[in-house]
Amino acid sequence: MRIGLFTDTYFPQVSGVSTSIRTLKEELEKEGHEVYIFTTTDRDVKRFEDPTIIRLPSVPFVSFTDRRVVYRGLISSYKIAKHYNLDIIHTQTEFSLGLLGKMIGKALRIPVVHTYHTQYEDYVSYIANGKIIRPSMVKPLLRGYLKDLDGVICPSRIVLNLLEGYEVTIPKRVIPTGIPLEKYIRDDITAEEVTNLKAELGIAGDETMLLSLSRISYEKNIQAIINQMPAILAENAKIKLIIVGNGPYLQDLKHLAMQLEVDKHVTFTGMVPHDKVALYYKACDFFISASTSETQGLTYIESLASGTPIIAHGNPYLDDVVTDKMFGTLYYAETDLTDAVIDAILKTPVMDKRLLAKKRYEISAQHFGKSIYTFYLDTLIARNSKEAQKLSLYLNHSGKSSSLKLVQGAIHLPKRAAKVTAITSVKVVKAPIKLVHAIKDFLD
């Protein structure tokens, strides 16, 4: 299958969406499919570096200068998509590249599906201080974008419930993003490495290590954990909170920890190298998060893949993930956070290897890729079925002469198909030599 992914965000822009798209591309390619990403230009990467990544002219997005939107490239994108003979388009944004993907899909008469990644009500206030898009505008804008698509993928039940509340009627399917397990299982990490890291962080052997790992922003609600630290320490003084990451809210959190006089039990590490993240997951006793704005949250399943249980503010997504006490403890009000931490420390059982192996497959990139491909197949079958019904209606309402022409045309189809296949095969053989030059010609 030949798939076009259309996104405003891709590496080197780091985000959960970028990670999800790269994971999907890699998993589909492992199964022999061709995947082409249509995205924005970036000054930190060469435009024609990878022939499977088509970068279109773009400018920084208002209020988010590290994010970009395309300002031209419709004709060139159409030519490239036609050249690659795409079977399906999968949009990952409702903005510039998403709209572009919809138009190209319509022009090529191929299915277009979408993944809804972001709950915009939580973020519209950051776009020109909420003067351009207000929360009340999200529903009609999203319904307008989705109404003529062939299907939408929901990364969690949170998104499914949201879209059903918006009365979105197109086919919907819950498919959480998976992760590459090999990056987090990491049996090569030794007990000595874990001990050394804890020593560096000032954690004694009899102390419990809680790990928060995320971008340090107000929405992540790390302040809720720090606010509860006095009460947590009153119950159990042998607890240390390690906060990994960087962001605009870092200094506020440091000040809060000092103000509450818990700074000796709260350590801020800043960013850590990506190849060290698994070590932190392995070293901690629990991964903790108080965020209420996540539609899924990859850090939760990264922790579980590492074999570490979580403590988190519950939601429909986590209800589906934490299916056993050994996987974690959920709470549903901030006032219950202290009790959740103490309960987790006292009552979390040892991980059962069989159940952990099953859970790891559920959250794996492999399972994610296969689930998306199945959705693509179902979408193509549904589209072909609709077209067949239209053809049937046409035949039933047309005269005998029209039917005869269709039959006569069908007689010559095998010859035409053979000829097209032969021509396509020659093009495929020549493609590797001319591919990069062809893309440059299209885009210039």
Per-range role (PLM):
Residues M1-V45, E49-R55, S403-D444:
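N-terminal subdomain of nucleotide-sugar transferases
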Residues P309-A312:
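Short hydrophobic beta-strand element within catalytic cores of glycosyltransferases
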Residues A204-K220, I226-M229:
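Conserved donor-binding/catalytic core segment of Leloir-type glycosyltransferases
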Residues T292:
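Aromatic "clamp/platform" in nucleotide-sugar-dependent glycosyltransferases that forms part
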Residues D324-T335, D343-P349:
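Conserved acidic donor-binding segment of nucleotide-sugar-dependent glycosyltransferases
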